[in-house]
């Protein structure tokens, strides 16, 4: 297809069709029919190609990480780009958004910041308000059953950080190696992490 898709896993739309991001110069999001493989639509991404993960909210809105300092795009299930981008001016890199049951979107930026947005694209909070937690250019946030947000970071502050749903820090765990993965949460609420040093960590 000529589609450039490093770091980008397909996602399923609310009606079960396949979503693919294109990181190339003609950066776009494609929807493909799940039964036939036929392309249903292709929409050029605003301000940069799809550079990282695609996540779909309960309302069917598609969120995709954009290349450059363009944040995350929002696209309807019918392929219409919505305004505004989430976090324009920040670098999304190869990061996946997390979306809660209320439609709030939690994203991480390469600059070492986590931010939350409502389902209309309005920023609710960001942490830290200034400075950095450590580079976040892979993986992304995960949401626990109680609404806690977990994210792993890289140098200069390789760590796992837990944030409240309102954006306040609950705790952090310093890692011996960088973390470039999304935390996984088991049925007991334990946090599972793999770091770049080959360590498997349970918190």
Language-model region placement:
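Extracytoplasmic/lumenal domain signature
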Residues: 1-203
């Amino acid at each position: 297809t000529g589609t450039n898709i490093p770091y980008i896993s397909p996602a399923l739309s609310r009606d079960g069709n396949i979503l693919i991001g294109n990181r190339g110069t003609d950066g776009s999001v494609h929807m493909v029919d799940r039964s036939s493989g036929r392309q249903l639509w292709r929409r050029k991404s605003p301000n940069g190609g799809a550079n990282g993960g695609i996540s779909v909210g309960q309302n069917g809105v598609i969120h995709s990480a954009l290349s450059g300092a363009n944040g995350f795009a929002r696209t309807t299930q019918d392929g219409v780009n919505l305004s505004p981008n989430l976090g324009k001016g920040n670098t999304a890199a190869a990061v996946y958004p997390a979306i809660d049951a209320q439609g709030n979107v939690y994203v991480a930026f390469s600059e070492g910041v986590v931010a939350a947005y409502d389902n209309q694209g309005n920023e609710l909070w960001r942490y830290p308000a200034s400075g950095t937690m450590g580079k976040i250019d892979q993986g992304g946030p995960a949401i626990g059953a109680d609404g806690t947000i977990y994210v792993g970071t890289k140098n200069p502050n390789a760590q796992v950080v837990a944030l409240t749903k309102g954006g306040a820090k609950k705790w952090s765990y310093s890692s011996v190696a960088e973390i470039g993965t999304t935390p996984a949460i088991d049925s007991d609420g334990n946090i599972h992490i793999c770091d770049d040093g080959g360590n498997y960590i349970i918190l």
